[in-house]
Amino acid sequence: MGKVVGIDLGTTNSVVAAIEGGQPSVIINAEGLRTTPSIVAYTKKEELLVGQIAKRQAVINPENTFFSVKRFIGSKEGEISKEAKKLPYKVSNDQNNNIKIKCPALNRDFSPEEISAQVLRKLINDATDYLGQEVTQAVITVPAYFNDSQRQATMDAGKIAGVEVLRIINEPTAASLAYGLDKKQNETILVFDLGGGTFDVSILEVGDGIFEVLSTAGDTNLGGDDFDNVLVNWLINDFKEKNNIDLGNDVQALQRLTEAAEKAKVELSTVEKTTIHLPFITADKTGPKHIEQELTRDVFENLCQALINRCRIPVEKSLNDARLDKADINEIVLVGGSTRIPAVQNLVESLTGKKPNQSVNPDEVVAIGAAIQAGILAGEIKDILLLDVTPLSLGVETLGGVMTKIIARNTTIPVKKSEMFSTAVDNQTNVEIHILQGERELVAGNKSLGNFRLDGIPAADRGAPQIEVTFDIDVDGILSVKAREKETGVEQAVTIQGASNLNEKEVEEMLVEAEKFASADKVKRENIDVKNQAEALCFEAEKEVSSFNDTVPENKKQNIKTLIENIRQAVQTDNFETLKEQMEELKTAMKDIVALKSTNDTATDPMSNLNDL
């Protein structure tokens, strides 16, 4: 098995890590940074930009710059809040209510999986360059509270990126691996994971190589983005009140406001007060308008109080599900950049009675844990057992619109469970199996994962046929369901597909499309390298020419200068074949003239014919 990497595919930033010399370490990306913004953009020239380079141009290209896409992955249109869709780029839905992201630059729509795949592809390419060997396999983390559709969609993103996803693991579980790798004594830890778009709490028993998840709870619609949005709305409302102009309808202003809000939020984690400067945010007939707004930490915390309070419920629920009191928790591990907010840290301390452990980097700990899991699969790390759980209950619809649970939440995975059902009416020869995920008693309150039909049931009185329904969850948390009629042995099975409904053909088409952009990106980078080499060659040649003495004929010098001029003109065009030919011509001419200069210098040296003393 080749090198397997661990990837934290985050809402705001992503990180890739690998085992090196027996220890997990974060991989530096092509820009020399340890984290990569989860941002993808397409320029008006149809060029693909990913990461930091995409983030830098967001203000001038807001409608074609896509961020926080993880909030949409594996979700239907009706499952996304109105607030989450308040973005500089446009989010719509297709005829099946699947989320689509509009890209005016290419005049086409993307699925969230396709956008996420471009981030994954960059991480894999950076890992390949850094490690000096091709990387094609990865362990990818997801929020613990991701449902089956969201997990399947993440797997699809990996396929589109050309990555073999060996394992999907929960982010808090990955963080616990990183924290507890060298722990010998048993500890009960609470992982509080507040990222850019999702929130998870997991409680685990850690020690002596065993990592057992006791419970998990969370909110997949709560994260740092929501704190940013509160500030954006505050700025929009304040500006509207003062100037009677609604900045919410201006996509460029909205992008600038979003960036300024994030910057202010980050600053207020270390200082008590900051000022938001946004010159020339818009203009009307009276002239340009500016924003210069002071923001204190107290005001920020008051604005975000409702969000901070939402963090309370999953902590209490997780403790209750694990049948533990806060006194039973030995350590609190903070994960995600949003846990740097002082009010969040204060909440955690008040709920648990303990100061959070600060020994791990909240931005990198999940990727480090994913790398450890990758190392386990690749045989680089041994003697570790990971016992994860399913975050939500799974079941089927039964008579009267009731959800009958087959696998309860917080059940250790992998797991297989069966229940017996029967027909509802006389002489019924088929049954519809409607698969659900959630905690509500009625079907309407839960997420529908899909359905299938079992035909060939012998005609009989209601309640007579015996239909065995088996739910099977694998180590990735992906669900398969099988229904079997006991008398005839007839059966039907289905692996639940993600809400994106991407079939194999669609995934293959998206992979080809993604590879096309990756190939174009590679060619573009190679061409830039050629131009840089050409400039360096011209510089060296000019330096050499200036050192020539009268022993080199003037026509030879002039030829070099002409070749340099031709190359500089070719650099301004995109004719790279011509440029390469001219570079070779200059190299040959320089070799000839340097050899000639050396011969002439030797011939004119009065000491050259003397023997060594």
Curated annotation (Swiss-Prot):
SS bond partners: none
Residues of the signal peptide: none
InterPro entries hit by this protein: ATPase_NBD, Chaperone_DnaK, Heat_shock_70_CS, HSP70_C_sf, HSP70_peptide-bd_sf, Hsp_70_fam
Example GO molecular function: unfolded protein binding
Compartment annotation: Plastid, Chloroplast
tRNA processing recorded as keyword: no
One of the record's GO cellular component terms: chloroplast
Primary localization class, coarse: plastid
SUPFAM superfamilies associated with the record: Actin-like ATPase domain (SSF53067), Heat shock protein 70kD (HSP70), peptide-binding domain (SSF100920)
Top-level taxon: Eukaryota
Keywords: ATP-binding, Chaperone, Chloroplast, Nucleotide-binding, Plastid
Family to which the UniProt record says this protein belongs: Belongs to the heat shock protein 70 family.
HAMAP family: DnaK
Purpose of the protein: Acts as a chaperone.
Protein name, as recorded: Chaperone protein dnaK
